[in-house]
Amino acid sequence: MDKFVKLTGVAAPLPVVNIDTDMIIPKDYLKTIKRTGLGTGLFAEARYNEDGSPNPDFVLNKPAYQNAKILVAGDNFGCGSSREHAPWALLDFGIRCVISTSFADIFYNNCFKNGILPIVVSQEDLDKLMDDASRGSNAVLTIDLEALEITGPDGGSIKFEVDAFKRHCLLNGLDDIGLTLEKGRSIDNFEKATAASRPWA
């Protein structure tokens, strides 16, 4: 998993509340267990017209936001059914950070496990960031995970909080497998000690 220390990129505004996982990645895209290629299905029902052509009115299809790295979204983002394909699709599209006033718990935790930083802010701060994100190609935010700070295009900053363990994992690029490998020496020592004390096992 790639480390997340500091991210600077265009932020796309998506002022819609209760965006569920089916909206993030429709069920038609859940047949694969590969993490790559799902970016094409991200927000598919909103991004594409019935004939499969891009919907020019959807924010991520607009030229200024096609390479967005940050999503500023409405309340209760990621609600609905549990599907890890949702953060996979966001990540495959290129989005490494989602900012909202609240997230569904399972989606929130899945983001950290897949290298995405979900940030919870107040409604007042979200309104400010949504306004910043509406500036098109000038909607550049910097997310500093070490400093726990968001810096807007006007230089103003907003502080945020993240669980210390989750922050450690993102800063060091540690997913569940990485965390296990980090304890490799301790595991080896335990197995050797067990083999010596219980040779019959």
UniProtKB/Swiss-Prot annotation:
EC numbers on record: 4.2.1.33
Gene Ontology cellular-component annotations: 3-isopropylmalate dehydratase complex
Pfam family membership, one: Aconitase_C
InterPro entries xref list: 3-IsopropMal_deHydase_ssu, Aconitase/3IPM_dehydase_swvl, AconitaseA/IPMdHydase_ssu_swvl, IPMI_Swivel, LeuD
A single MF term (Gene Ontology): 3-isopropylmalate dehydratase activity
One BP annotation, GO: L-leucine biosynthetic process
Keywords (A to Z) from UniProt: Amino-acid biosynthesis, Branched-chain amino acid biosynthesis, Leucine biosynthesis, Lyase
Catalysed reaction equations from the record: (2R,3S)-3-isopropylmalate = (2S)-2-isopropylmalate
Pathway: Amino-acid biosynthesis; L-leucine biosynthesis; L-leucine from 3-methyl-2-oxobutanoate: step 2/4
Subunit structure: Heterodimer of LeuC and LeuD.
Entry-linked HAMAP family: LeuD_type1
Family: Belongs to the LeuD family. LeuD type 1 subfamily.
Function, as annotated: Catalyzes the isomerization between 2-isopropylmalate and 3-isopropylmalate, via the formation of 2-isopropylmaleate.
Protein name per Swiss-Prot or TrEMBL: 3-isopropylmalate dehydratase small subunit
Source organism of the structure: Sinorhizobium medicae (strain WSM419) (Ensifer medicae)
